[in-house]
């Protein structure tokens, strides 16, 4: 399966991306490489793998949620260029 320029344009429109004309060829090549890889994966013989075997040896890779040392208010204040009444002071972003 290959993506042509028309398909790339449709994908860009659907995903609200703007692909500059000088990027189109490289983007097409990248998409097509990804699709070739997906085709390789689709071609693998996985008939010998049972569905439930995938999950049998799975261990939780997430570390335990343990409380640790925390920073004091003074330490936190020292990181900020401006800190007032217990809050970080930042430049105004939204005009009202």
Swiss-Prot record:
Catalytic activity: L-glutamyl-tRNA(Gln) + L-glutamine + ATP + H2O = L-glutaminyl-tRNA(Gln) + L-glutamate + ADP + phosphate + H(+); L-aspartyl-tRNA(Asn) + L-glutamine + ATP + H2O = L-asparaginyl-tRNA(Asn) + L-glutamate + ADP + phosphate + 2 H(+)
Gene3D superfamilies attached to this UniProt entry: Glu-tRNAGln amidotransferase C subunit, N-terminal domain
Role according to the record: Allows the formation of correctly charged Asn-tRNA(Asn) or Gln-tRNA(Gln) through the transamidation of misacylated Asp-tRNA(Asn) or Glu-tRNA(Gln) in organisms which lack either or both of asparaginyl-tRNA or glutaminyl-tRNA synthetases. The reaction takes place in the presence of glutamine and ATP through an activated phospho-Asp-tRNA(Asn) or phospho-Glu-tRNA(Gln).
Assembly mode: Heterotrimer of A, B and C subunits.
EC class name: ligase
Family: Belongs to the GatC family.
Keyword Ligase attached: yes
InterPro entries registered for this protein in UniProt: Asp/Glu-ADT_sf_sub_c, GatC
Name of the molecule in the record: Aspartyl/glutamyl-tRNA(Asn/Gln) amidotransferase subunit C
Gene Ontology molecular function: any one: glutaminyl-tRNA synthase (glutamine-hydrolyzing) activity
Entry keyword annotation includes ATP-binding: yes
